[in-house]
Design a protein with these regions (language model features):
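Active-site-adjacent structural elements that line small-molecule/cofactor binding pockets in enzymes
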Residues: 1-306
């Protein structure tokens, strides 16, 4: 299948809106609850669910094998599969085997991770761009036995111009997260029309008895902006050092969708209008997975109308 055909097939399978499986950061959930969550999200009308991983605690591709088997049509993507969790050749083989078993239901999103994750497996992080390039090239290396002959889209976590250029050169697209819609527009222009652009969007739903959604969003955005690379990416979208230091309203509104289901949908639509093929709200998940799923079920009528 030609690269453009892979992208077109992925666009058709994913649809414009998916969702991240709402497991609280740094935690896990019993696999039976995850099966139930995936089935409920499928019944709610979501066509795609994204998961992630760090290093240790779980294996995202094993997780997807369970969830693919538990659902009928749902597309699953890794957002992201961490390159320090498995060798490149193993990642290729595992993804190809899943794609062979479940055609058109897998998107492999890869990310370079962080130095501490490389150190956890006794590896040198190196220069991120060179490390990621080397990993992608090793995925294509021949093995004995060969990997399954199955086609699936590969996309690359990319929030900056250099990693975005690598995504355009060696993969089927990019997976940015936590940036404003103006950055989505720049990324679409840089990628061109023939690459897949999947955007993760932080989402904070107004809940009775909880702090206001915008204030929860402000706290999360402020914490995220402590990462220098994200602060620099935000500056490229025109925000000032003062706005970043203050975490002002305009910055919060640009970096997170918050409020009612209709307001969340409007925030997602901003990215679709800017050129995203697919958007995935990332809920500020609490510890109860199935309660978080209830929130996504309430969101479904508004966001799936996009």
């Amino acid at each position: 299948m030609a690269p453009s055909s892979v992208v077109e097939a992925a666009r058709a399978a994913l649809g414009p809106v998916g969702v991240y499986l709402p497991i609280a950061l740094g935690t896990n959930a019993p696999i039976d609850e995850q099966r139930t969550a995936a089935r409920r999200l499928e019944r709610a009308g979501y066509r795609a669910v994204w998961t992630n991983e760090s290093v240790g605690g779980k294996d995202a591709l094993v997780q997807l094998s369970v969830l693919l088997a538990a659902t009928e049509r749902m597309v699953f993507g890794t957002g992201i599969a961490n390159i320090w969790s498995r060798p490149a050749q193993t990642a290729q083989a595992a993804a190809a085997q899943l794609a062979q078993a479940y055609p058109d239901r897998l998107v492999l999103g890869l990310g370079v991770g962080y130095p501490q994750q490389a150190a956890a497996v006794d590896r040198e992080f190196g220069r991120p761009l060179a490390t990621m390039r080397g990993y992608l090239e090793k995925m294509a290396a021949p093995t004995v036995p060969p990997a399954a002959d199955a086609v699936f889209p590969r996309i690359l976590a990319a929030n900056g111009p250099k990693m975005l250029a690598l995504a355009a050169e060696l993969t089927d697209g990019a997976l940015p997260f936590g940036l404003p819609a103006s950055a989505t527009a720049r990324m679409r222009q840089a990628l061109g029309p023939d690459k897949l652009l999947v955007v993760g969007v932080s989402a904070f739903v107004e809940e009775p008895g909880a702090a206001p959604a915008r204030e929860r969003a402000r706290a999360a955005v402020g914490a995220a902006l402590s990462r220098p690379w994200l602060a620099e990416a935000v500056k490229q979208s025109g925000f000032t050092d003062r706005q970043i230091a203050d975490v002002d309203d305009a910055l919060v509104d640009a970096l997170a969708a918050h409020g009612t289901p209709e307001a969340i949908a409007a925030g997602l639509q901003d990215h679709l209008a800017a050129g995203a093929d697919h958007v995935g709200p990332v809920l500020d998940a609490g510890p109860d997975l199935l309660r978080n799923v209830e929130t996504l079920e309430r969101l479904a009528p508004a966001v799936l109308a996009l």
